[in-house]
Amino acid sequence: MRAIVALFCFVLSTSAVAQMGGHAPVRVWQDTLTLPTYEEGPPDSNPPFDQFVTNGRYNYPYTMRENLSDRASPHPWRALNLENEYLRCVVFPDLGGHLYRCIDKRNGADMFYANPSLKFARIAYRGAWAAYGIEFNFPVSHNWMTASPVDFATSTASDGSASIWVRNIDRVYGMEWSVQLTLQPGQAVLEQKTTLYNPSRTRHRFYWWTNAGVQVWDDTRLYYPTQFTVFHGFTDVDTWPVNRAGVDLSIVGNHKDGPVSRFSYASNEPFMGVYHPHTNAGVVHYASRSDLPSKKIFSWGGDADGLQWREALSDNHSAYVEIQAGLFRDQETYGFLDPEQSIHFTEYWLPIRDIAGVTRANPDAVLFLSRVPSANSSRVLLEVAINAARSFPFAKLLLRDGTGTLATDNVSLSPAATYRKRFPDLPADKTYSVTLTDEAGATILSHTEGEYDFVPKGDVQTELPRAYAYPAIEKRSEGDFLELGAEQERNGMLLEALATYRAGLVRFPHSLPLTRSLGRLEVSLKQIPAAIEHLSSVIERVSNDQEASYYLGIAWLSAGQLDNARRAFEVSEQFGTFRPPSLYELAALDTRRGNLEKAHERLAAAAREFPDAPKLGDLDITLLRLSGHNQVAMDRLAVLLKDDPANSFLRYEAARLGQEDKTLWAHLAADPERILEIAIQYMHFGLYNEALEILVRDYPSGVSVVSEPGMPLPQQYPLIAYYRGYCRELLHQDGAADFRAASRMPTKYVFPNRPESFDVLKAALAANPKDANAHALLGDLYMSGGMQDAAMTEWEAARNLNPAIPALLRNMGYTVLHASGSPERAAELFVEGTKADPENAENYLGLEKALRVAGRSPAEQAAALQKYPGKAPPAQLVFQLARDLAAAGRFDEAQRELATRFVSREEGGASLLEVYVAIKLEQAKSLAQKNQCSEARALIQHLTDPVPQLSLRKDALVEESQSQSARQKIAAIEASCAK
């Protein structure tokens, strides 16, 4: 019997391998990879409200992670591994789901930048960012979770392929991205399938850029099939590869004049590549124009500043470039995703070796076609080199010259070997074409020398129009207000857009488009009474305005007016953009009425009609389970999990249906907001028992729970307890114990922004008006929606009860300052904050700013900062203190302050180098004003001397001293001394 079973298993396995073309199935597994990793301190305890943003990066409700160090230690990272006979790839699910490396097993070369240490700098939206591998940027660049754990899973398929899945739902907009990385048996290509999806109730801005770091050397060549490039903001068209200055930027060693950051322009070609003569290896990226039409190259450059970035981001002084692919023309361009809209696209990554360059590429093969001059200038040798991504055993190569076929070569192509063919003694004045076909005669790849899908040069707009300048507010048209508001929304400036729409309605009080836009944005900002007023006025004039009806329905839901909400959704569900989310909302209302069968029918039909809106099917699993149709639910769940195996809600539903998932609970425990995300989906359908079930669970702790720095455990997260108590009350149970527990929990790093939290926190305050935590968190929630007055009212109540709540007085002080209030009043709040929350550096920075606004002396400003008791002041405090001391004439003290702690580099921000040079020039200016010009000139003369205690090198000092700002200051000093 054993022999029969063994034979049966052998037949099955050999049959499976035969279906894979004789190749073994792809392996996928999880283990750990230990790397030297630079330590990160606790995150900033202050909520980064939009009102306080100065750099255009909106992060609330996330913490800021700028507390970086110069100390490294070995760190074991969870690693997801994917391997076939040609490639072995590693993904870090705890670092934004980045692909860390992909090794070409044929030559041991890394396709991407496998930085041997993880060294963080302040580059990402929240701060911490490290250079390596592939980063997934959605809905913003270097997004909020780029250095944090995300959802992940692995899967295998019957064709022998295997996949790694990574995904995330962000907390700022509630938008979701998902990436599936797949290897097929016997193929040397990594497939990347991406889905972008808006499961939230309101529209939000987005873009997508795949960002792949590739290690480079001076002889590395960049193959971007384009004749022109354009700079950020769609400005400054230049030529490629040789720019207008005569520099060939396709050679990395030529990047000597600062960073190179260019987007392809006027090209329809779908590929790009990097090749290293240093290693005879490289990588090619392919995405059709219908998927990702835009390409970008970024390099820090090889000048002094670029070399500093190498030091800041690596321990081995390695250089890398970023090859990027995106949806829009540049990284200043955003679009909108409406509720339940999704986008899908596919990219391919191909390793190349022993091919010398890239002429053309697609997912099947990469071609390098080159001419070798001969002694006779009228003759040439044509060399063809091909890397096949998969096997073509009966391929044929055809060489043509435009008049006919010159030669053919029957060849068996395989990823295991590079194909080369030389065609000698050809006329040099001819143009040659190479075509590769398979055994059926279908074209695998074809190229004609010099022919690319470019916009004809004569049609290329090289002088770009200036950006539209909006007229003064009193001269703006209705369209000006609408487009400016939309532009501000696309840039994340929601409060500015709100002000723009309101200003537009002052000028055009009867404008339906402005009223609709304002009402929609008010819903997004949780300003519900105002939204109901504005959207109702639109419906009064246009009864079938579907957008206004949909958002009015959301507003009525938030106000608890369910019948009004249903009537609004019955209009918006009729057809068009808002039909899918309206069907979802109507199903939720059906369930709240107890009509689960009607809700199921509605969701099932909606899921069939809109398969790209996956949330429509997710809740249907719950309805089937609660209706007793467990087997149907399990069958449907299996289908959904096949397409989205990392979905935490689906994983939880599987567990509710009895399927074992040992890692689910640790995954949920790693971020309490994952638990709330699931609970709120149940609550939205009125399924409070289901919500309570996940909220009351005892979650694990310890090494199995992998969280980002500062993340509280669920059992210490007050919002979990508040939601628990709220659900109990709606179930006619006693929620007092939960509310009481929440009131005693620490609120550090707890920043509410979900609209559902209004009812939850108000219920807690109804139960206990003296709950300081609930007042403080409700104030944060109001502030997140731009409602400063309501926020201050709640914060004042919290202050009277417990002024030591983290960030409370900081929030109040900055709100007074940003409302152009009394700087003296702000200073009082900050002084109180230094006593109640003494380790919070922003209380001291806020006090310094209030004193500055009040016109107090630099010495007083410096004294405020010097009271900070912490051992590791943030860079902002160090730099501001140094500037204030310099302004007070205490230059030696200012320079000493710069040496007090390690300051990580910040892209686009102030650097230690910049502040040092500014201080020295301020000192020279002071000397000149005292007629001590010889001393001033001597100081300027020695400005570029190395400063070992600050790790400032001469080349960097020379470069900074030649900046426009420094030159202007030096010129002013010299002019002063010349008088």
What spans do the regions from the language model cover?
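A contiguous, surface-exposed recognition patch within enzymatic or periplasmic domains that forms
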Residues: 31-41, 47, 78-82, 98-101, ...
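Extended, loop-rich substrate-binding clefts of extracytoplasmic carbohydrate-active enzymes
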Residues: 48-75, 79-83, 131-188, 305-335, ...
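Acidic, contiguous internal or C-terminal segments within carbohydrate-active enzymes
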Residues: 69-71, 83, 90-108, 166-217, ...
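Single-residue signature of alpha-solenoid repeat helices
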Residues: 497, 531, 565, 599, ...
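Structural marker of alpha-solenoid helical repeat scaffolds
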Residues: 507-508, 540-542, 575, 609, ...
